[in-house]
Amino acid sequence: MRRSLALALTAGSLAASAASAQACPDARAITRGVRAPLSHVRYLADDALQGRLAGSPSERCAGDYIAAQFRALGLRPAGDAGTYFQSLPLASAVDPHAIGGTGRNVVAILRGSNPALAGEAVIVGAHYDHLGHGGSFSMAPGDSSIHNGADDNASGVAAMLDVARRLARGPRPARSIVFIAFTGEEEGLLGSSFYAGHPAVPLDRTRAMLNLDMVGRLGAGPLIVYGTDTADEWRAMVDSAAAAEGVQVRGGGDGFGASDQTSFYARGLPVLHFFTNVHADYHRPSDDWEKIDAGGLERVAAVVARVARGVASRPAALTFHRAAAPAQAASGSGYGAYLGSIPDFTPVPDGVKLTGVRAGSPAEKAGIRAGDVIVRMGEMEVHDLQGLTNALRAHKPGDTVPIVLLRDGQRLTVTATLGTRGG
């Protein structure tokens, strides 16, 4: 980004923040009687926050709240011009339906304790935007009620803040920890992709990324951890951390998926995505804070804190591994049917451009290849990664669907028989 643009965006961000400060809902009043980390969900998923649509005034209030929590924990600001905010344009060729304007990642650093390793970092992140009043990504078409996004993803932000609390109270890890609340995830991983291109700590000195997305419904079920095949050491580290907290885990697979870890795996970092599975309230107005498993949320945060501390304190870097096998999922229903396409985040005017397909996948069998742009699947137009995810979720394994592609400027249709992840 050019310096002039960066300064302009920063100035606009600070001005908007100052202008909206008095209008933001009173966090103390909203969270009275609710203990952290659930109190963070209680605030972020309150009706007064209007669903935290990326770039909206209510999302700015959410960002201000998160920055205040970082400040209270003693974390250093790592955004623009000495602030906690990293401004970015939300208008995107990847998603022509994005709200536009300027969004903000909220970025803070817990400095590492070892002078020789403090210049290296581990990222712990969670997106804080949601759907506002619904729109095209809602699973309740035509319902313009507030979509509060308690599990998706106020829960991830709350868990991230609890991880920060646990690590800040000491002993501090050897490496630094970068905590990031991402904007624009629902619009196509905009915030995480921008940060990956403009990192507070260079990515060649960033050792791993831990993503928390939808971690508020643990209940009796296992904690799902995607991405354990992205480093040789992950499985043992995750199993050890979970066992110490009495949490059952299930997972595996590579680092590609419909959440922010993808932006970092695509750039060669080991990643994990912590997840407590999909549910009937996903992308609906009914995803409210009262349904969050408070005890489970704390246990997830405890597991992630152990993993983060382990990665940040180990003498050697992780052994990165780009998994060849399809991503594993604990439940075939979690992300719908499986195609096996690998997205390329290079902006295109419309659709989802692919960097490749997985060997033996339905995509490969259908003749889809690197460089293709998916613009339609079945009856659904595909404008962006979220649209592709929604199209897959609308189908079940075994469905045979026409897929419209753009290849070398030509429009063509192939037919794919969708499979199951890991099958």
Roles of regions detected by a PLM:
Residues A21-P77, G119:
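N-terminal hydrophobic or amphipathic helices/low-complexity stretches enriched
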Residues C24-T31, D47-P57, D95-P96, P141-N153, ...:
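Second-shell loop/turn segments in exported
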Residues L44, F70, L88-A93, G100-S138:
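Acidic/His- and Gly-rich active-site-bordering loop/insert found
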Residues R52-R111:
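A non-catalytic alpha/beta surface segment that caps or lines the substrate-entry region
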Residues A108, V124-H130, G135-L189, V304:
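Alpha-helical metal-binding/catalytic segments enriched in His/Glu/Asp
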Residues R172, F182-H279, D293, L297:
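Metal-dependent peptidase/peptidase-like ectodomains
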Residues A280-A324:
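His/Asp/Glu-rich mid-to-C-terminal helical/loop segments that flank catalytic regions of hydrolases
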Residues V303, A312-G423:
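C-terminal recognition in membrane/secretory proteostasis and scaffolding
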